[in-house]
Every structure is written in structure tokens, then in C-alpha cells.
């Protein structure tokens, strides 16, 4: 009976330590996902900017691939919710003829997302981009 409080205290301490370790790992994973989303958005900007300057189709498809990286990272971020908007934009980017007419808008939105992929106003601009791309589809 006298050992029961000591055992409970030890188990509580152990559980607290495990919780803290798991929480640190989750924070690190979140930071890694944000970094991946940022780099995907930045690479999308670079590729589409190069395509706009030089007209190389390889840059166009590289931009689509970079957007896919951004999309997958955002899908794993808890604050992003559904990735339906990213899927819709990605689907429109797969048809480069329609997307080429809106390269300046795509670049502008992705520059915002490259700064902070969790920013609500940048996310709103992504919704507007989706609507713009779907109008021309």
C-alpha cells in the first residue's frame, strides 16, 4: 500500500516524458511540412517565371510537378483542411494551354504561398486562382 503512490508517481512522470517527446516530434514534423510546402511553392514560381521568360515547355511541366509537391505537403498540414482547391488547380495546370494565359496570376499566388503556405489570405487567393482557371476551361 505504501508503494502504490510511488508507483503511480513514477508512471505519471514516465507518461509525461513520453507525451513531451511525442509533442516535440509533431512540432518538428509540422515545421518540415511547412518548409516542404514553401519550397514547392517557390519552385513553382521559379519554373513558371522561367517558362514566361523563355517559353520552354520543360519549365511548364516542372512547375506542374513543383505544384504537386506543394499540394501534397499542404494536404498533410492540419490547418489547411481539405486540399480540394489544390486538386482543382493542379487539374487545371495539367492543361498547359489554358494555364499559360494566366501565368502572371499563378506566379503571384505562388509567391504569396512561398512566403507562408498557412496564411489565410494567400489561401483565399488560391481559391480565386482556381475560379479563374476554371472559367477558361
Residue ranges with predicted function:
Residues 3-22:
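Hydrophobic membrane-insertion alpha-helices, especially the h-region
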Residues 5-6, 26, 41:
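Sequence-pattern detector for short linear motifs
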Residues 9-10, 45, 130-132:
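Enrichment for repetitive, rod-forming helical segments
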Residues 13, 35, 118-120:
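N-terminal cationic amphipathic segment used for targeting or macromolecule association
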Residues 16-35:
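Transmembrane signal-anchor/signal-peptide helices with a preference for the extracytoplasmic
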Residues 36-95, 124-128:
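Alpha-helical segments in soluble extracytoplasmic regions
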Residues 98-137:
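C-terminal amphipathic alpha-helix
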Amino acid at each position: 500500500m505504501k508503494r502504490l503512490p510511488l508507483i503511480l508517481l513514477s508512471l505519471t512522470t514516465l507518461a509525461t516524458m513520453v507525451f513531451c517527446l511525442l509533442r516535440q516530434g509533431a512540432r518538428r514534423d509540422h515545421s518540415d511540412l511547412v518548409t516542404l510546402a514553401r519550397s514547392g511553392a517557390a519552385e513553382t514560381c521559379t519554373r513558371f517565371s522561367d517558362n514566361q521568360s523563355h517559353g520552354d515547355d520543360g519549365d511548364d511541366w516542372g512547375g506542374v510537378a513543383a505544384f504537386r509537391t506543394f499540394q501534397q505537403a499542404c494536404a498533410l498540414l492540419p490547418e489547411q483542411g481539405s486540399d480540394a482547391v489544390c486538386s482543382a488547380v493542379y487539374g487545371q495546370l495539367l492543361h498547359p494551354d489554358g494555364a499559360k494565359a494566366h501565368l502572371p496570376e499563378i506566379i503571384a499566388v505562388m509567391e504569396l504561398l512561398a512566403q507562408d503556405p498557412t496564411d489565410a489570405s494567400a489561401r483565399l487567393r488560391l481559391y480565386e486562382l482556381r475560379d479563374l482557371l476554371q472559367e477558361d476551361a
